[in-house]
């Protein structure tokens, strides 16, 4: 595959999604530069990266790669957009890493979903964060070529998309994919009654940042009775004891994923509306959630501008 093909078919959707998510989550604008080939021996780790292994027509890694100062600036902007405040100490601490992970997961999840939907012969692993060269080591093994595209952000610096190529099917004929992935994977109801403002709503996410963001959005919408759970297993216990009227739940979590929690919840309660929120998923997970009776399935991000409108569209029974 040529550099042009690798860029247009594989990296371009990630770049599109990164710019769209950057704008949606932070209000910042950016633009992509021209692709070029990096020498493997000259590759330098810049301070923060989100990595996703890929197999199939190409064996390699998609890497979204930041200088630390850019990572801090973007992380602060994501925090500000989600919860209305940000860490100002200028260091890449746990809270900023969580904000960056949310943005990175959104980009990788939406781009890989879109590529897989077009059956191009690629499979992608869930993204992982690399904070130093030791974390990066496994991803660099066997890499023969690196395609790099710089992305410039207004007043924040730049980051890079790298495609680390271990092996590629040189005979593969691939057409570029230009559209951005669907926002709604299970659409909202077309009719019904809005959920009362005093209803008990449970928000489930293993990210404290997202729990805070959901609480902020729901509170601004007038909902006053909100409880949270930090993973799928605690959500099940909370459902048993508190019996919420409505649930918003993340899919990918540390101890028990949301689709597995949904299955167990449906054994307890077949009627409570449960809307799944995720940026990292696949068609099998979506179909499973449909079968289990999910009230909706939404692709993140949810930001201050559009988040309330999206949530309101599902808060109907």
Sequence positions of predicted segments:
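Composition-driven recognition of glycine/serine/threonine/acidic- and proline-rich low-complexity segments
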Residues: 2-182
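Short amphipathic alpha-helix used as the core "switch/output" element in two-component signaling
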Residues: 237, 259-270
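Conserved acidic segment of CheY-like receiver
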Residues: 198-210, 214-218, 247
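Alpha4 helix (beta4-alpha4-beta5 surface) of REC/receiver domains from two-component response regulators
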Residues: 260, 281-296, 306-309
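Acidic catalytic/metal-coordinating carboxylates
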Residues: 231-234, 252, 256-260
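Non-catalytic signal-transmission and effector/linker regions of two-component phosphorelay proteins
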Residues: 170-200, 305-317
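Active-site beta3 strand of CheY-like receiver
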Residues: 242-248
């Amino acid at each position: 595959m040529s550099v042009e093909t690798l860029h247009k078919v594989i990296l371009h959707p990630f770049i599109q999604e990164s710019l769209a998510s950057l704008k949606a989550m932070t209000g910042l604008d950016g633009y992509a530069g021209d692709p070029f080939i990096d020498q493997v021996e000259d590759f330098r780790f810049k301070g923060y990266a989100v990595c996703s292994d890929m197999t199939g027509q190409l064996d390699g890694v998609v890497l979204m790669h930041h200088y630390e100062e850019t990572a801090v600036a973007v992380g602060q902007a994501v925090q500000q957009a989600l919860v209305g405040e940000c860490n100002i100490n200028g260091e890449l601490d746990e809270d900023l890493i969580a904000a960056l992970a949310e943005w990175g997961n959104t980009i990788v999840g939406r781009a890989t979903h879109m590529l897989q939907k077009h059956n191009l012969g690629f499979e992608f692993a869930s993204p992982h964060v690399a904070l130093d060269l030791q974390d990066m080591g496994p991803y660099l093994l066997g890499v023969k070529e690196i395609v790099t595209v710089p992305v410039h952000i207004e007043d924040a610096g730049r980051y890079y998309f790298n495609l680390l190529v271990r092996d590629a099917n040189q005979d593969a004929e691939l057409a570029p994919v230009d559209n951005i992935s669907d926002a709604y994977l299970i659409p909202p109801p077309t009719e019904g009654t809005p959920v009362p403002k005093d209803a008990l709503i449970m928000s489930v996410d293993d990210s404290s940042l997202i729990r805070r963001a959901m609480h902020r959005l729901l509170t601004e919408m007038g909902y006053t009775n909100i409880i949270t759970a930090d993973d799928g297993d605690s959500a099940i216990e909370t459902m048993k004891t508190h019996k919420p009227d409505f649930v918003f739940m993340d899919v990918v979590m540390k101890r028990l994923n949301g689709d597995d929690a949904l299955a167990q919840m449906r054994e307890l309660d077949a009627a409570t509306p449960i809307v799944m929120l995720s940026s990292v998923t696949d068609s099998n997970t979506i179909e499973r959630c449909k079968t289990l009776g999910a009230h909706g399935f939404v692709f993140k991000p949810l930001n201050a501008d559009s988040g309330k409108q999206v949530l309101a569209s599902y808060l109907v029974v």
